[in-house]
Amino acid sequence: MLYLSNTLYISFKYQEEGEYMHFNVKEDILQLTPLWKGERFEDGRPKVSDEDIAELKKLTQEQIWESLWENDYKNQFESHLMQIHEDDRKLIGRAVTAAYIPSRPDLFDVVEEIGHSEGRKGTHNLWVVDKLVDGDVAVVDMYDKVYEGTFVGGNLSTAISTNTKTGGAVVGGGIRDIEQISKIDNIELYYRGNDPTPIKDFVMTSYNAPVRIGAAVCLPGDIVYGYKGGVLFIPAHLVKYILAQSKKPHVKDI
């Protein structure tokens, strides 16, 4: 596997004809999440059960945060985000992660070649949206770019709604078409800001690898818990522990 700086995470594999690269590599995801012992998706992501996700939804951010903090997971919360629906709904689902950086011609050509070899079509944001499934939440590091950094607009938000049913996205960057998106009832988006410009001048550097959203770190398969402008990323292997802890009496604030 190849790391270039903090953001480029492309896996190298080997065949008789030589070296080649891939995004969203199962073996990499397995290495990143060894503490998860349960069911997994075909791509290797931890698959926390629907039942456990439903139980998490009953908890407050503070209940979850306390268990994370006690286990030294102190970089799991980000609050400097906007959200589409200003009501009491929660966004909870399994993370699909992606990261991007400003484009440059040689790197863009390399990434395009990788994507085409994997059958990916369209722009690099579409590569992620197209593959989302029920209950997924896209967690996207767009390097806080808002102007020309609009990861989704109305059409891709509709696609997220169709693919995930109850999911959404957390975007460390921009979105557009907020009037149209706000009318999609079964989706929730957290984002840095909105702008009417279309997305451009960006290139994918990782897909289902570790990403950063502000002060928080997310791995593929983490459970995303969003409420009122704040988002927690819950390691899959801690979900059972958090649910058990929530049933114990607590008599003081930390």
Report residues per predicted region.
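Short, Lys/Arg-enriched N-terminal segments with co-localized hydrophobic residues
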Residues: 8-20
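Terminal leader/tail segments of proteins
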Residues: 20-26, 84, 247
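Short acidic, Pro/Gly- and aromatic-enriched capping/linker segments at domain boundaries
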Residues: 21-39
